[in-house]
């Protein structure tokens, strides 16, 4: 109802699109996203939700046993305690199975064919963002490829970052050509300088650089 044409320039939309008040989108291609108020999106090659997704929730992470046993499952509010119960309490199989079932139920409840960008978020100079829910006041600048994930409030994802099947908690930072696959990044955790992680759970206030 308060849309103004000057909010858009050289934009291609496909599918189900919603745009909040005062949001500006320039030189970008977007499909199946609902974008909140006061966002700024500029020079994004492709931001799309191609199919139903749970945005990283319910993804199995083999953090303890690389052969796939003792799997922890990602969800937005994962804690070290819950991860410990899933991976280390195998003498209580019924309890572990119930926790995993609850996480999978939650993932299914949150699944959608439309992804979201929260209020006050900035996304600029980025290549591919696919099936990623982005919360409020996030900054995404110069990422290479994000897929099947959630980016928590106030977080930053920077230049040449790649991430697939991931969840970032609030105020986390991933920058400097770092790469994540099947990872949980806890609140205020910083990952930088080409750090690479696969099947890893980082809880609050970690700082990782130059390694894997």
What is each PLM-predicted segment?
Residues 1-212:
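Domain-scale signature associated with acetyltransferase and cell-envelope carbohydrate enzymes
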């Amino acid at each position: 109802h308060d849309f103004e044409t000057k909010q858009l320039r050289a934009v291609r939309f496909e599918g189900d699109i919603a745009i909040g008040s005062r949001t500006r989108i320039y030189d970008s291609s977007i499909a199946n996203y609902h974008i909140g108020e006061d966002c700024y999106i500029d020079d994004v090659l492709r931001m799309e939700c191609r199919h139903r997704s749970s945005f990283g929730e319910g993804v199995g992470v083999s953090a303890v046993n690389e052969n796939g046993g003792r799997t922890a499952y990602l969800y937005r509010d994962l804690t070290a305690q819950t991860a410990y119960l899933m991976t280390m309490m195998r003498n209580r199989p019924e309890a572990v199975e119930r926790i995993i079932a609850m996480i999978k139920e939650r993932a299914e409840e949150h699944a959608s064919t439309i992804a979201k960008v929260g209020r006050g978020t900035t996304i600029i100079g980025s290549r591919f963002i696919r099936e990623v829910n982005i919360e409020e006041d996030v900054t995404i600048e110069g990422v290479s490829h994000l897929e099947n994930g959630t980016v928590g409030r106030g977080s930053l994802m920077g230049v040449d970052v790649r991430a697939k099947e991931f969840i970032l908690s609030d105020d986390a930072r991933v920058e400097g050509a770092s790469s994540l696959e099947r990872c949980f990044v806890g609140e205020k955790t910083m990952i930088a300088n080409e750090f690479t992680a696969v099947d890893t759970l980082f809880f609050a206030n970690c700082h990782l650089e130059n390694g894997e």
